[in-house]
Structures are given as structure tokens and as C-alpha cells.
Amino acid sequence: MFTGIISDIGKLEFNSEDEIHITYSNNHFSNLEEGTSVAVNGCCLTLRNYENNKLVFQVSTETLSKTNINPNNNNYVNLELPATLTTFLSGHIVQGHVDNTALVDRIEQLDNDMWNFYFKGVDTKYIIQKGSITINGISLTVVDPEDDKFHVAIITETYNRTNLQYLKEGDTVNIEYDMIAKYIEKQK
């Protein structure tokens, strides 16, 4: 389980068909054990090993086909360590199970150093106005869901601490819908 509060941004490199290396700069990752879960762009991956500020993960064909963790996408990824019983939950409960990907439709910089990011290609039956959504592992609040689109308002702090700063229109992002919304929809 994760909180959607990003610890660091890493640089993704493909070492082989099923192995990725992520270079990071933050000390949060210096004392990890092999087998630890790490959210990479919101996708829960198991740490194979690490050395010299580099995390190594094995990735399945399923992960490569269902997420934006692939050689054709942006090489900057958001990283988060799993929550513990003492973790301050300042985002929302994130499982690290990517539901689908969406496209960045438009990015709008506002006058007050804030941004609106518009996304399309989502299943809005799991999205409500002011509800939680996870985009590339980031806990965010939905604005104006309609048809297969919605947008989020991004403050400077979130923009600077995440890979949102590297996104451009047409890029693919990972989406995890709110777990409670998925359970409610299943009960219908």
C-alpha cells in the first residue's frame, strides 16, 4: 500500500526485455532490502537489487503492456516507498495496481504558477467530482469528469516534486481509480 505522496523522481533505463534500472538521487532508497515493494509511476514493483543509487526491477510482459513503463514513454518516473503503520496518510490509499493508462490531452499553465492537466481515455464510472485518483502514482483530486475526460489542478509543490514537470501533450500516464469507487461500482 502507498499514499500517493512521491518520494523522488528516477531516471528509467531498460537493461533487457524484462529488467529495468532506475537511477535516483534521494536517500530514502539507500537502506532497502531486496524484495521490497516500490511504486514506480504508481505501479507496485518488487526490488530485485540496488547499488550506487540504482534500483533494479524485473518487469512482466503484463506490466509492460498495461502501464506506461516501457521504452517508448517518458523516462522520468515517480518513486514511492510503501506505507507503514506510522506513515502519515496525506494522500489517499493507493494499491499500486494500475487500472489503465490515459493520454495527456492538454496542459495549461496558469498565471499563478499553477497548472491544469487534462486527461482523456479514462473510465469515468469510477471518477467523481472532487474524488481521489492516482496519476503516475500521485494522489490527486478530480475536477470536472465528463465522458472519458477529466482534469486536475496542480500546485507548484506537486509540479516540482513529480514527473508532471516532464509531461507533454500526447504522453501516456498510469491511472489507478479510487479503490472505494471500484468496490461501490462492483456492488451495482
Residue ranges and their predicted role:
Residues 1-188:
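Conserved loop->alpha-helix
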